[in-house]
C-alpha cells in the first residue's frame, strides 16, 4: 500500500515538473495536479502515523500491569482521532474533490467506531497490579462488573468493524483436562484451590485457540454479565460471566455452557485485564503462579496482537479505497464550493494588488 501511494505521488510529481519546466505561471491544471499530489502525500503521512502504533503490540508479558492495557487502548483511541483529523484536513486543504471526500467520509466512520470502542475498553483495564495478579492460599477475586462490561462493550465495537474471522465456540482440548480449571476461581480450603496441573490446563486451553477465537468469544458474551452469588463459577455461561464470577466455597468447576477453550481463554483474559480480577492458587505452588500469570498474559497478548493486526488491515483497506478514488479524480471533479472559494481568494488578492 505504501509503495502504491508513493508511486502515485512520484508520478504526479514528475508531471508537475514537466508542466512547470517552462517557468510559466501556474495554470488551473497545475493547481489541480499540485492539490492531488498534496492529497497523496497527506494520506501517506497518515499511513506512517498509524504504523507507529504497531510498535510494541506484541510485548504483553506476565509483569505487564492492568493499567498498561488501559493505556494501550487509549493509544488506539488517540491514534484513530489523529488519523481522522489528518484525513479530513487533507481533503479540506487540497480541493474537496467529492469522489475522494466520499471515500474519506466512509473510512472516517469506521475509524470513529474503532475510536469509540477503544475509549470504552480503556475504562475497563485499570489497576496498578500485574494483569494475572494471582494469589496463593487466598480466595480468587472477580473482575469488577463495570470494568468487565467496559472491556466487553469496547472490544465488541472494535471487532464489529475490523474482524470476521474466529470461532466463539472453538474447542480443541479434552473435557477431562478442563474440569479443574474452575479451581482458579474458587473460595474454599487450600486443598481445593488450583495447583499447577489446573494452571497448565488453563494454559492449554489458551494455547489451543487463536486470538480471533478469543475475541469472538468476548463478542458473544452478554453485556452486564450476571454474577451468581450462590454458585459462582459453576453458573457462568460465557466469558464475561467467568470474569465476574464470585468465589464461592467448593464451587470449582466450569460447566458445559462455558467449557469451551475459546470461552475459557476469553474469560481468563477479561478477568486478567479487569480491575480487581485475580486467580486462586494453592499455598506453596509457586510454579502454578508462574504458569497462570504467563497464561493470562498470553491470552491478553493474543487479543491485543490480533486486534492491532485487524485494525491495521482495516486501515490498509481504507487507504486503498481512498487511493483508488484519488486515481480516478479529474480536474473538473473539484467541487463547486471549493472552486468558488479559490476564485474568491484569487480575486481578493488581485484587488489588493
Curated annotation (Swiss-Prot):
A lipid is attached at residue 19 (N-palmitoyl cysteine). The keyword Glycoprotein does not apply. Its main location: membrane. A lipid is attached at residue 19 (S-diacylglycerol cysteine). InterPro entries: Borrelia_lipo (IPR000680). It is found in: Cell outer membrane. Genes for both Vlp and Vsp families are on (usually) unnamed linear plasmids in B.hermsii HS1. This is Variable large protein 17. It comes from Borrelia hermsii. The gene is vlp17.
Amino acid at each position: 500500500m505504501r509503495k502504491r501511494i508513493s508511486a502515485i505521488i512520484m508520478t504526479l510529481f514528475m508531471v508537475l515538473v514537466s508542466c512547470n519546466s517552462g517557468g510559466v505561471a501556474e495554470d488551473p491544471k497545475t493547481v489541480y495536479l499540485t492539490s492531488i499530489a498534496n492529497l497523496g502525500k497527506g494520506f501517506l503521512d497518515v499511513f506512517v502515523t498509524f504504523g507507529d502504533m504497531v510498535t510494541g503490540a506484541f510485548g504483553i508479558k506476565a509483569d505487564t500491569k492492568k493499567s498498561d492495557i488501559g493505556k494501550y487502548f487509549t493509544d488506539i483511541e488517540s491514534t484513530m482521532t489523529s488519523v481522522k483529523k489528518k484525513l479530513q484536513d487533507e481533503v479540506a486543504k487540497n480541493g474537496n474533490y467529492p469522489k475522494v471526500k466520499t471515500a474519506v467520509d466512509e473510512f472516517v466512520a469506521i475509524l470513529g467506531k474503532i475510536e469509540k470502542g477503544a475509549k470504552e475498553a480503556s475504562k475497563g483495564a485499570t489497576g496498578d497490579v500485574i494483569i494475572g495478579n494471582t494469589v496463593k492460599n487466598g480466595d480468587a477475586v472477580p473482575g469488577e462488573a463495570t470494568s468487565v462490561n467496559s472491556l466487553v462493550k469496547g472490544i465488541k465495537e472494535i471487532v464489529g468493524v475490523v474482524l470476521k474471522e474466529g470461532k466463539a465456540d472453538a474447542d480443541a482440548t479434552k473435557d477431562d483436562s478442563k474440569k479443574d480449571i474452575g479451581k482458579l476461581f474458587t473460595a474454599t480450603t487450600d486443598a481445593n484451590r488450583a495447583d499447577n496441573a489446573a494452571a497448565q490446563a488453563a494454559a492449554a486451553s489458551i494455547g489451543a485457540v487463536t486470538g480471533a477465537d478469543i475475541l469472538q468469544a468476548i463478542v458473544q458474551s452478554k453485556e452486564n454479565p450476571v454474577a451468581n452469588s450462590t454458585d459462582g463459577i459453576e453458573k457462568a455461561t460465557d466469558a464475561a460471566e467467568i470474569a465476574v464470577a464470585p468465589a464461592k466455597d467448593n464451587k470449582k468447576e466450569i460447566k458445559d455452557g462455558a467449557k469451551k477453550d475459546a470461552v475459557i481463554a476469553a474469560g481468563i483474559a477479561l478477568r486478567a485485564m479487569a480491575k480487581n480480577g485475580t486467580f486462586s492458587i494453592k499455598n506453596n505452588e509457586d510454579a502454578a503462579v508462574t504458569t497462570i500469570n504467563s497464561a493470562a498474559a498470553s491470552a491478553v497478548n493474543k487479543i491485543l496482537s490480533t486486534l492491532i493486526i485487524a485494525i491495521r488491515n482495516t486501515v490498509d483497506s481504507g487507504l486503498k479505497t481512498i487511493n483508488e478514488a484519488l486515481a480516478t479524480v479529474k480536474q473538473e471533479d473539484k467541487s463547486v464550493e471549493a472552486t468558488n472559494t479559490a476564485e474568491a481568494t484569487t480575486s481578493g488578492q488581485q484587488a489588493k494588488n
